[in-house]
């Protein structure tokens, strides 16, 4: 089984400007790409798990999301970072049409993580879930991910978020150092 870093997107990898769906809105958080390079070098799979309710709400299309995701994936690949899995939830209970559903994939439910664990043969005991909200921490716990990491680069940190997180970091840039410290 493989070890993995499960990554939220908005507020964790990129600045959350609210419903980011255009390339010109997308800015990687300082140090995030370098952190991903280090995590890759440490032997971790990198798995994106992102809620995208903007699709359900009609703010942007699934095609627009997929185009931005392809651009992000290529931008990372150009810097030597390959994402091993990309999982997203386009649903919301207040969504429109086919996207209006109470699904198992929308965080805080663990559906996306459980699917990745199964498809990519991931060991939850050696893996980390990284995100900026309590929903990310709850999804990690629901999937039995041993380590949940809350980052301060997105939504304001809540007491609930702190309680659910094993670790709270300034940003994902600090994650490789944390992991190295845990191993020593």
Swiss-Prot record:
Keywords: Carbohydrate metabolism, Cytoplasm, Hydrolase, Lipopolysaccharide biosynthesis, Magnesium, Metal-binding, Zinc. Its main location: cytoplasm. The keyword Cell inner membrane does not apply. The keyword Protease does not apply. It is an enzyme of class 3 (hydrolase). The record marks 106 as: Contributes to substrate recognition. InterPro entries: HAD-like_sf (IPR036412), HAD-SF_hydro_IIIA (IPR006549), HAD_sf (IPR023214), Heptose_bisP_phosphatase (IPR004446), Histidinol-phos (IPR006543). Its EC number is 3.1.3.82. Coiled coil: none annotated. Its cofactor is Mg(2+); Zn(2+). Pathway: Nucleotide-sugar biosynthesis; ADP-L-glycero-beta-D-manno-heptose biosynthesis; ADP-L-glycero-beta-D-manno-heptose from D-glycero-beta-D-manno-heptose 7-phosphate: step 2/4; Bacterial outer membrane biogenesis; LPS core biosynthesis. Pfam families: Hydrolase_like. GO terms for biological process: ADP-L-glycero-beta-D-manno-heptose biosynthetic process; lipopolysaccharide core region biosynthetic process. It is found in: Cytoplasm. GO terms for molecular function: D-glycero-beta-D-manno-heptose 1,7-bisphosphate 7-phosphatase activity; magnesium ion binding; zinc ion binding. It catalyses: D-glycero-beta-D-manno-heptose 1,7-bisphosphate + H2O = D-glycero-beta-D-manno-heptose 1-phosphate + phosphate. Zn(2+) binds at residues 89, 91, 103, 105. The active site is at 8 (nucleophile), 10 (proton donor). Mg(2+) binds at residues 8, 10, 132. Substrate binds at residues 8-10, 16-19, 50-53, 106-107, 133. One of its GO terms (cellular component) is cytoplasm. Monomer. NCBIfam families: GmhB_yaeD, HAD-SF-IIIA, Histidinol-ppas, PRK08942.1. This is D-glycero-beta-D-manno-heptose-1,7-bisphosphate 7-phosphatase. It comes from Pasteurella multocida (strain Pm70).
């Amino acid at each position: 089984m493989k070890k993995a870093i499960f990554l939220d997107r908005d507020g964790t990898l990129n600045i959350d400007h609210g419903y980011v769906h255009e390339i010109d809105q997308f800015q990687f958080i300082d140090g995030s790409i370098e952190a991903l390079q280090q995590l890759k070098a440490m032997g971790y799979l990198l798995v994106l798990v992102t809620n995208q309710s903007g699709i359900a709400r009609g703010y942007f299309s699934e095609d627009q999301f997929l185009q931005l995701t392809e651009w992000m994936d290529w931008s990372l690949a150009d810097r030597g970072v390959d994402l091993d899995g990309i999982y997203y939830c386009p649903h919301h209970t207040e969504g429109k049409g086919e996207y209006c559903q109470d699904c198992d994939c929308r965080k805080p439910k663990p559906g996306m993580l459980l699917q990745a664990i199964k498809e990519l043969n991931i060991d939850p005991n050696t893996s980390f879930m990284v995100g900026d909200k309590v929903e990310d921490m709850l999804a990690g716990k629901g999937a039995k991910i041993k380590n949940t990491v809350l980052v301060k680069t997105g939504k304001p940190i809540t007491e609930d978020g702190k309680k659910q997180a094993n670790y709270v970091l300034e940003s994902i840039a600090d994650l490789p150092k944390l992991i190295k410290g845990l191993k020593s």
